[in-house]
């Protein structure tokens, strides 16, 4: 399963959003995890998209760590080890 398409202004309506940066191995682990579970998500580039970076900071209270996981508009955590519980 692939991540669903990114549409501006709909982050609040999506069940799962992952803020990432290109080349981040932890971000890829998060993507692989959710894909393996068949859980649709949207993947935003928080490194190159200033709007998405600001959005990520609003959820994470300024924490720049990626991946930043948001589910149903609720911040679950940043970084990747075990999948966050939501």
Regions found by a protein language model. Name each.
Residues 71-86:
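Non-catalytic, surface beta->alpha helical segment in thiol-disulfide oxidoreductase systems
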Residues 45-63:
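Thioredoxin-like thiol-disulfide oxidoreductase module
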Residues 3-42:
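Local sequence-structure signature of Cys/Sec-based thiol-disulfide redox active-site neighborhoods
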Residues 60-70, 80:
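Structural micro-motif
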Residues 22, 45, 79:
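Residues at the C-termini of beta-strands that transition into short coil/loop
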Residues 8-10, 58, 67:
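Short secondary-structure boundary/capping segments
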Residues 25, 48, 76:
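Glycine-/small-residue-rich active-site loops that bind phosphorylated ligands and cofactors
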């Amino acid at each position: 399963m692939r991540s669903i398409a990114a549409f501006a202004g709909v982050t609040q309506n999506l069940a799962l959003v992952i803020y990432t940066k290109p080349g981040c191995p932890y971000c890829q682990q998060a993507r692989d995890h959710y894909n393996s579970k068949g859980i649709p998500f949207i993947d935003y580039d928080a490194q190159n998209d200033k709007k998405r970076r600001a959005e990520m900071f609003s959820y994470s209270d300024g924490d720049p760590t990626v991946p930043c996981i948001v589910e149903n508009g609720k911040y679950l955590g940043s970084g990747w080890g075990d999948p966050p519980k939501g």
